[in-house]
UniProtKB/Swiss-Prot annotation:
The gene is adk. Monomer. This is Adenylate kinase. It comes from Buchnera aphidicola subsp. Acyrthosiphon pisum (strain APS) (Acyrthosiphon pisum symbiotic bacterium). GO terms for biological process: AMP salvage. It comes from the Bacteria. Consists of three domains, a large central CORE domain and two small peripheral domains, NMPbind and LID, which undergo movements during catalysis. The LID domain closes over the site of phosphoryl transfer upon ATP binding. Assembling and dissambling the active center during each catalytic cycle provides an effective means to prevent ATP hydrolysis. One of its GO terms (cellular component) is cytoplasm. It catalyses: AMP + ATP = 2 ADP.
Length: 215
């Protein structure tokens, strides 16, 4: 089962991806996590990525495709994987096709952009595990502490109002053409494409996902 998750920052696709991972035992490959891990390594490519992210721009297709190609070769992807945050552009989608990387499902999470600012600015992250909380919608049991480890939660540097607006502007430029590409692929019978209302409750979305992934 090979799945692509689409959706603007703050739609909750990462959280739902974790649910799919736990239920179907396939890894969730987050390009955001991969990019941040590269930055932490402080190697040549990591420093390039760091500068791009701090400017609020999107990392080039060449860099992201290189990271994805190496990741899906690993043994834990033998039964499938979830791509979270990839592809972001038509070029990245065509890269998958060119490399004969078969995708079964494309799931797009939809939410009005006016709600995204509130969702993202309230996010708190457990950096070691990737667990995501929200001060309003999904608060930790103890303020600013991870439920399982008790370690301190952080706010991403680019989760400021200015950073969020920049990311949404960049996202809009490439999102619509990408969705149209996958709608076309659905009509050709190459993939199964579904749009999901991300304003629904977590449990409602999960039930919907279970129904979709049985098809």
């Amino acid at each position: 089962m090979r799945i692509i998750l689409l959706g603007a920052p703050g739609t909750g696709k990462g959280t739902q991806g974790k649910f799919i991972t736990e239920k179907y035992k396939i890894p969730q490959i987050s390009t955001g996590d991969m990019l941040r891990e590269s930055v932490v390594l402080k190697n040549k490519i990591g420093m390039i990525i760091k500068n791009i992210i701090e400017e609020g721009k999107l990392v080039s297709d060449e860099i992201v495709c290189h990271l994805i190609k190496n990741r899906i070769k690993k043994h834990d992807c033998i039964n499938g994987f979830i791509l979270d945050g990839f592809p972001r552009t038509i070029q990245q989608a065509l890269y998958l096709s060119k490399k004969n990387i078969k995708i079964d499902y494309v799931l797009e999470f939809i939410i009005p952009h006016e709600y995204i600012l509130e969702r993202i600015s309230g996010r708190r992250i457990h950096i070691q595990s990737g667990r995501i909380y929200h001060v309003k919608f999904k608060p930790p049991k103890i303020k600013d502490k991870d439920d399982l480890t008790g370690q301190t939660l952080i706010t991403r540097k680019d989760d400021t109002k200015e950073g969020i607006k920049k990311r949404l502007e960049e996202y809009k430029k490439v999102h619509d053409p990408l969705v149209q590409y996958y709608i076309h692929e659905k009509k050709r019978g190459n993939i199964k494409f579904f749009q999901i209302d991300a304003m629904l409750s977590f449990s409602s979305i999960r039930k919907k996902l279970e129904t979709i992934l049985k098809k």
